[in-house]
């Protein structure tokens, strides 16, 4: 026969066990600037995997990008916020901005898991990047912290030595480099970036000089 305390303990344990972990997608990038391709990818992953939210995580100082072509992280974060403000699935993740310095995914995800140990993270990358996972910093430790989500790309295999969930999403041939070049030449970027992002770029005179 169980005592009241034993019964209460059992109920509490079962309740705690039944609490589902939050399932959060992470889309990292320079977002220089964010464009509709980013939003479509994030929406498709969130919907298909049933995630609680998808967070856009701007790099503070990208390890593999020419710093001369990367505008201030504050502007990039502000543009992300403008791009996602009307979508309840999306959030801005500032972990790499808070940490500062060069952004390595392993260090950032270790930081996030320490803050939110009960959150299950899904790290979203293009299918063209999956082949290069073996070159990522501390990849063997990183795969213990996150589940990788690969966006299928034509011409790239859907296999990997690492665990990857593959997702189909519309292929939108938009690049931030292309957008910067168009702006620097005075061309329209309508339908390439959200209207709020285009307005922010114009207001702050971003990318007006040639790359």
Curated annotation (Swiss-Prot):
SUPFAM superfamilies: Nucleotidylyl transferase
Keywords, comma-separated and alphabetical: ATP-binding, NAD, Nucleotide-binding, Nucleotidyltransferase, Pyridine nucleotide biosynthesis, Transferase
Any single biological process term in GO: NAD biosynthetic process
Pathway in which this enzyme or protein is active: Cofactor biosynthesis; NAD(+) biosynthesis; deamido-NAD(+) from nicotinate D-ribonucleotide: step 1/1
Assigned EC number: 2.7.7.18
Gene3D superfamilies assigned: HUPs (3.40.50.620)
Domain of life: Bacteria
GO molecular function list: ATP binding; nicotinate-nucleotide adenylyltransferase activity
Pfam families reported for this sequence: CTP_transf_like (PF01467)
Reactions it catalyzes: nicotinate beta-D-ribonucleotide + ATP + H(+) = deamido-NAD(+) + diphosphate
Family: Belongs to the NadD family.
Function comment: Catalyzes the reversible adenylation of nicotinate mononucleotide (NaMN) to nicotinic acid adenine dinucleotide (NaAD).
PANTHER family reported in the protein's UniProt record: NICOTINATE-NUCLEOTIDE ADENYLYLTRANSFERASE-RELATED, PHOSPHOPANTETHEINE ADENYLYLTRANSFERASE
Protein name (record): Probable nicotinate-nucleotide adenylyltransferase
Species whose genome carries this gene: Lactiplantibacillus plantarum (strain ATCC BAA-793 / NCIMB 8826 / WCFS1)
Gene responsible for this protein: nadD
């Amino acid at each position: 026969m169980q005592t009241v305390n034993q019964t209460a303990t059992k109920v509490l344990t079962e309740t705690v066990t039944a609490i589902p972990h939050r399932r959060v997608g992470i889309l990292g990038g320079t977002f220089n600037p964010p464009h509709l391709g980013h939003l479509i990818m994030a929406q498709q992953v969130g919907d298909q995997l049933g995630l609680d939210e998808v967070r856009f995580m701007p790099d503070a100082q990208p390890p593999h990008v020419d710093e001369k072509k990367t505008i201030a992280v504050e502007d990039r974060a502000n543009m992300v916020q403008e791009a996602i403000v009307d979508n309840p699935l999306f959030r801005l993740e500032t972990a790499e901005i808070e940490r500062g310095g060069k952004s390595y995914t392993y260090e950032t995800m270790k930081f996030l898991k320490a803050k939110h140990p009960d959150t299950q993270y899904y790290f979203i990358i293009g299918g063209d990047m999956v082949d290069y996972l073996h070159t990522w910093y501390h990849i063997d430790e990183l795969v213990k912290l996150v589940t990788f989500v690969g966006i299928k790309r034509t011409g790239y295999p859907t296999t990997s030595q690492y665990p990857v969930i593959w997702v189909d999403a519309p292929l939108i041939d938009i690049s931030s480099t292309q957008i910067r070049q168009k702006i620097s030449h005075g061309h329209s970027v309508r339908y390439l970036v959200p209207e709020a992002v285009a307005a922010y770029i114009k207001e702050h005179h971003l990318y007006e000089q040639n790359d």
